[in-house]
Amino acid sequence: MTDKVVHFEIPADDLDRARAFYQQAFGWTINSLPELDYNIVETTPIDETNVPTEPGAINGGMMRRQAPINSPVITIGVDDIDAALQRVEELGGKTEIPKQGVADMGFTAYFSDPEGNLVGLWASAQPG
């Protein structure tokens, strides 16, 4: 099975303005996580474990714009971030932000592909 796009992120210079825009323009629910300086963006209904209930639908996040995350980013779910970053680099990509923990939820990292696009990786702390 191939790895899937599981998340998106939208950077913003003014988080209040960006939250209001996406809530009003698209009806998205946006919840702040101040302890992580991050916002959860719900574009589709979720279950009790915060997983989208509609097949193929994804939710995302919003955070303050800071390099290298200057434009929207898709995030690919993988089982092993270290192995994924190794493959990326073997194929001409570059690690931009190394693996880091996100509370007790999982791990994230960012890489640029050979075309210069920034892409995120996510590995859940919970298997499956």
Describe these PLM feature segments.
Residues 1-21, 71-76, 123-128:
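N-terminal beta-strand motif that seeds the catalytic metal site of vicinal oxygen chelate
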Residues 2, 9-56:
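Core segments of cupin and vicinal oxygen chelate
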Residues 10, 33, 85-128:
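Vicinal oxygen chelate
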Residues 15, 35, 67-69, 103-104:
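Short strand-connecting beta-turns/loops that link adjacent beta-strands
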Residues 37-41, 72, 105-109:
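Short beta-strand micro-motifs in enzyme catalytic cores
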Residues 66-94:
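Mid-chain, well-packed structural core segment of small domains
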